[in-house]
Amino acid sequence: MSICIKDQIQNMNIVIGCTVGCAYCYARNNVKRWHMIDDFADPDFFPGKLKMMEKKRPQNFLLTGMSDLSGWKPEWRDEVFAKIRENPQHQFLFLTKRPDLLDFDTDLENAWFGVTVTRKAELWRIDALRKNVRAKHYHVTFEPLFDDPGTVDLSGINWIVVGTMTGAQRRKIHTEPEWAWSLTDQAHTLGIPVFMKEDLVSIIGDENMIQEMPEEFNKVLEVQRSWQK
């Protein structure tokens, strides 16, 4: 049976708000519904949440579930990176749709930097990520897939996630199973783990789901389970 990625990776919304302006943005709708900040297009930083990183029980954290890394002020990023360095028991993920706006180096061993790609025309984001963010770990999220991305240069990428449209617009967008399988085959050829999100079950079948995590994430989950015994 397929698993939900949210059971493996916890959101930590240190920054809320995004300047990208995607039409299908679930985060913007949630912020408006719950009145989290005044203006979603003007991101806010919540440094008090950094204390969550001090927990000893290891976690895999996504830090950009309600933001885009390109919209973080450099001083916010520096403060978060410093806290990440102090807490090697966790793994931390970042995502951006605008890697062209980033330019930094980091030697953090437990930080993963990724881009979202929804269509072939956005493949440039992968190259921009490798060029502009000089880091130890890279990942790519192909979600929601609007068309066939074709042949993808995944060199240097350590993990990919594949998914389709969810929520109210899910009936308007149809991801073909061949697109997901093509990405999976390309990644596996390079030894890259693939995680198919649970929303693909209706498209490719639960028995065909591939849900692989990087070894670093698996180690965190193993320690979590040992703490629960």
Model regions: which residues?
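Nucleic-acid endo/exonuclease domains
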Residues: W72, F142, E176-P177
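Structural alpha-beta junctions
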Residues: E86-F92, R134-H137, T184-V194
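Hydrophobic faces of well-ordered beta-strands that scaffold small-molecule active sites
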Residues: F61-L63, F92-F94, A111-V115, Y138-F142, ...
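Active-site-proximal loop/turn and secondary-structure-junction residues that shape catalytic pockets
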Residues: S67, R98-D100, V117-R119, P144-F146, ...
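Short capping loops/turns at secondary-structure boundaries
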Residues: T118, E122, I173-E176
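Conserved Radical SAM active-site core
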Residues: M1-W112, K120-R134, P149-L154
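Long, well-ordered alpha-helical scaffolding segments within enzyme catalytic domains
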Residues: E79-A82, L129-H137, H174-Q186
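Auxiliary Fe-S-binding modules of radical SAM enzymes
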Residues: M1-I9, F146, T151-K229
